[in-house]
């Protein structure tokens, strides 16, 4: 399990930190990745498909997040403050 050092408590939900991945799926405009928390060494991201949460994951980069968009599994996330 990856551990992430917290940068701050800011949660971005409707911001510029939203990445569209419809070009990588048979997606609608409601498919996107949102960064929930930013850490020094990665991000916690939420994947939505058709407006519903698909899963949440910890990733080191936005590129890694985009590679995982087809993995529809729930994940437990642990944090190191």
At which residue positions do the language-model features occur?
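Low-complexity, intrinsically disordered regions enriched in charged/polar residues
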Residues: 29-30, 63
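Short aromatic-glycine-(Arg/Gly/Cys) micro-motifs in beta-strand/loop hairpins
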Residues: 30-54
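Mixed-charge, Lys/Arg-enriched low-complexity segments
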Residues: 2-9, 47-81
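Negatively charged, low-complexity tracts enriched in Asp/Glu with abundant Ser/Thr
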Residues: 1-29
């Amino acid at each position: 399990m990856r551990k992430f050092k917290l940068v701050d408590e800011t949660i971005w939900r409707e911001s510029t930190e939203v990445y569209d991945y419809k070009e990588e799926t048979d997606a609608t405009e409601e498919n996107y990745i949102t960064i929930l928390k930013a850490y020094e060494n990665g991000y916690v991201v939420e994947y939505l498909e058709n407006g519903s949460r698909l899963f949440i994951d910890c990733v080191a980069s936005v590129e890694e997040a985009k590679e995982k968009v087809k993995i529809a599994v729930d994940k437990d996330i642990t944090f190191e403050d």
